[in-house]
From Swiss-Prot:
GO MF, one annotated term: metal ion binding
Protein name, entry field: CTP synthase
Reactions that this protein is recorded to catalyse: UTP + L-glutamine + ATP + H2O = CTP + L-glutamate + ADP + phosphate + 2 H(+); L-glutamine + H2O = L-glutamate + NH4(+); UTP + NH4(+) + ATP = CTP + ADP + phosphate + 2 H(+)
Subunit composition and interactions: Homotetramer.
Family: Belongs to the CTP synthase family.
Residues reported in the UniProt entry to bind ATP: S15, L16, G17, K18, G19, I20, D72, R239, D240, V241
Role of this protein: Catalyzes the ATP-dependent amination of UTP to CTP with either L-glutamine or ammonia as the source of nitrogen. Regulates intracellular CTP levels through interactions with the four ribonucleotide triphosphates.
Activity control summary: Allosterically activated by GTP, when glutamine is the substrate; GTP has no effect on the reaction when ammonia is the substrate. The allosteric effector GTP functions by stabilizing the protein conformation that binds the tetrahedral intermediate(s) formed during glutamine hydrolysis. Inhibited by the product CTP, via allosteric rather than competitive inhibition.
Length: 542
């Protein structure tokens, strides 16, 4: 199979939405019958984002095969059907780590290791391997043109485009076209300079996507075309919209996909965006709304919970209700009390790490249990629910997780010392292991107990969900907690680890050790989130 490459770069400022723009174009091309994949190349020196602060970087998206990746890969999976893997995201840190390891082994036969050709060659190799087997590979370069860290990646894609030829490679550049209210006009100069910088390193954009808070007039598009040497029809206006799922239709309306297929000489049918039209219809025509409180540690940056946010929206689409998310810092629950949780239709406690705010999450789980408020716990959200139940129902005073209190008399949650990875191989860990890359990661098989709410929600006794955690339920307490009324409704493939818990005497109280949000998409939703939102809406109406 001959793979074509679309390299996506950004200029002027960061956070313009390169990932969403690239994913939207990929969605249109997929709707034309093409097999599409996407890669994200991150210039930072971290080996992966696994140990980075969510406040700085946003969420860590976990792939089925256990890679800790950039949150843009979540956008990719939500827009196209292709599942991302370890091949779809790599960083400068990963490149340098691997190249230096090979140098230590003597694989370069004494050569002086340099950015060109050794680093750039490794980047090209990874791009080619990640794109193998697909008609189209969208390759997004993180950061902006002009960043020092991006230079090796930009040089690598310049070389790769030259090597494969113009009929197999093209460049899409995303820029900001600001509107100055004082002058009452759109300013194109930043875009002109951004393209000039890109051209100075040998990259000539074929498509220019112009981000603005409004549609860019034809006269301004013509001006941009003139000064950037990009065809006017390829100067695409991407205005602000109230839903990211409108972007595919916005790009298609301007013929962006047609530019691609003509350039690559592809004979493919027109894009069928019926599924996306259905998504937009449900989004625009809700029959009600619910307010869900998300009680977490990183609430100052919603992107820290990006996939959870989107999964709740998807569940709203499936139930034809608007989901309003109220972010609540778990420390505020500790300081101000559970009264701040009043008037919520449901409560969700997402994953997280560290002791700060954990008692607030435990209080939140108690409030939801005692007041019959629908509760969904994810990862740490399951652990705090279990700790709360152990303390206040099972009579295990001062029960806790050893992550937060190594001296607790009742360690109902403890460090996993061994587990099976996504390939069924045994993994080991102890207190001295590195933090990075040593968690239970990736998609794992889970057995649900027949007759439980979790089994009814999924409609199956076996499921696959993605994990990212070091701590698990202590099996020594399972019998005691079961006798107190806690239901262990899901277990790992070898039945050794608790995956799902629930409470019977409650309208809807389910918590899972896994991260179901990573499997939710706007077109398909996710059964756990759909049931959670449905229960919230039902109780609101009762």
């Amino acid at each position: 199979m001959t793979t074509r490459y679309i390299f996506v770069t950004g200029g002027v400022v960061s956070s313009l939405g390169k990932g969403i723009a690239a994913a939207s174009l990929a969605a249109i091309l997929e709707a034309r019958g093409l097999k599409v994949t996407m890669l994200k190349l991150d210039p930072y020196i971290n080996v992966d984002p696994g140990t980075m602060s969510p406040i700085q970087h946003g969420e860590v998206f976990v792939t089925e095969d256990g890679a800790e990746t950039d949150l843009d890969l979540g956008h990719y999976e939500r827009f196209i059907r292709t599942k991302m893997t370890k091949r779809n995201n790599f960083t400068s840190g990963r490149i340098y780590q691997d190249v230096l390891a090979r140098e230590r082994k003597g694989e370069f036969l004494g050569a002086t290791i340099q950015v060109i050709p050794h680093i750039t060659n490794d980047i090209k190799r990874r791009v080619i391997e990640g794109a193998e087997g697909y008609d189209i590979a969208m390759v997004e370069i993180g950061g902006t043109v002009g960043d020092m860290e991006s230079q090796p990646f930009l040089e690598a894609i310049r070389q790769l485009a030259l090597e494969v030829g113009r009929d197999r490679a093209m460049f899409m550049h995303l820029t900001l076209v600001p509107y100055l209210a004082a002058a009452g006009e759109i300013k194109t100069k930043p875009t002109q300079h951004s393209v000039k910088d890109l051209r100075s390193i040998g990259i000539f954009p074929d498509i220019l996507v112009c981000r603005s808070d409004r549609a860019i007039p034809n006269a301004e598009r013509a001006k941009i075309s003139l000064f950037t040497n990009v065809e006017e029809k390829a100067v695409v206006s991407m205005r602000d919209v109230d839903s990211i799922y409108k972007i595919p239709a916005l790009l298609k309306a301007q013929g962006t996909d047609e530019i691609v297929v003509k350039r690559f000489g592809l004979d493919v049918p027109e894009a069928d965006l019926t599924e996306w039209e259905e998504v937009l219809y449900h989004e625009a025509n809700p029959i009600g709304e619910v307010t869900i409180g998300m009680v977490g540690k990183y609430t100052e940056l919603p992107d820290a919970y990006k996939s959870v946010n989107e999964a709740l929206k998807h569940a709203g689409l499936k139930n034809q209700v608007t989901v309003n998310i109220k972010y609540i810092d778990s420390q505020d629950v500790e300081v101000k009390g559970v009264e701040i949780l009043a008037n919520l239709d449901a409560i969700l406690v997402p994953g997280g790490f560290g002791e700060r705010g954990v008692e607030g999450k435990i209080l939140t789980a108690q409030y939801a249990r005692e007041n019959k408020v629908p509760y969904l716990g994810i990862c740490l959200g399951m652990q705090v629910a279990l700790i709360e139940f152990a303390r206040n129902v099972a009579g295990l005073t001062d029960a806790h997780s050893t992550e937060f209190n190594s001296e607790t008399p009742h360690p109902v949650v403890g460090l996993i010392s061994e587990w099976l990875d996504e390939e069924g191989q045994v993994e080991y860990r102890n207190e001295q292991s590195d933090l990075g890359g040593t968690m239970r990661l990736g998609s794992q098989l889970c057995h649900l107990v027949k007759g439980t709410k979790a089994c009814d929600v999924y409609g199956s006794e076996t499921i696959n969900e993605r994990h990212r955690h070091r701590f698990e339920v202590n099996n020594n307490y399972r019998e005691q907690l079961s006798k107190a009324g806690l239901i262990f409704s899901g277990l790992s493939s070898d039945k050794s680890l608790v995956e799902v818990i629930e409470i019977a005497d409650h309208p809807w109280f389910i918590a899972g050790q896994f991260h179901p949000e990573f499997n939710s998409t706007p077109r398909d939703g996710h059964p756990l989130f759909e049931s959670f939102v449905a229960a919230s809406f039902k109780l609101q109406k009762s």
